[in-house]
Amino acid sequence: VVKDVCAAALLALLVAPRPAAADADALWYIVSEQCVPDQEQFHSPKPCELVDFGAGYVVLKDRVGDTQFLVMPTARVSGIESPEILAQDAPNYWDDAWRARRFVEERVHHPLARDDISLAINSLDGRTQNQLHIHVDCVRPDVQAALRDNASAIGPTWAPFPIKLSGHDYMAMRLAQPEFTHVNPFVLLADGIPGARGDMAHYTLVVVGVPDGFVLLAGRATGATNRGSGEELQDHTCALVDKFRQTSPVKSAEFRRKAPNGREPSVRFYPLAH
């Protein structure tokens, strides 16, 4: 179970001490006390990969896996249950997360197809951190295959996905557009599934790219055997990159990381965030 595994090793203390080491505000501490002030004072986002003040989000490399990144607001937003994410003028963190797939590509040294990438947010029951964070990583190969094999069953409105994914039931819908610029998946969930708007805390939401847009998957926490952790559909080992092992890594500047200029601040914590 994703939550149980992660709770056991939430933080790794590297340099400076912090009170209440294994607490649910660890991610917010990293955002508000490290990434944001270091970007403001020293023009370096570390320990984050990116701080975007204009759009109001950061990108942080998670300790789990080689290719997993987290997209988080610079504002205090607890999670999928937060009413502000459904506001008409709410920042579209899914659009930011989709753009952040480039960090995954940089880690595998190769461009990835749309259907190799997934985004996921866990339910209140299925997470350990109380700062909204969208997981960006490769999709599990078996989930990718299931979506391809059952593509004809996924339409423009929410409907039960024909088979279980990772042993759990999901609702699915297809979004036929390449970006999230004009649509908020949180709102599609809240307004598209009866009763979801008043019960968002118990929902998990996953987005998987497809050639002509996206597939959205929504699951609901139902108890100890299903905590609503859509992150279970992601592969933090990114086994999909095995198909590139017979090809040469991309060497272009697009996939080379540049070292940040200025001061490199001490890194205190890296979370196992879920």
Give a label for each model feature.
Residues 1-2:
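N-terminal secretory signal peptides that target proteins for export/translocation
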Residues 5-16:
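Bacterial N-terminal signal peptides
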Residues 21-274:
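HIT superfamily nucleotide-processing domains
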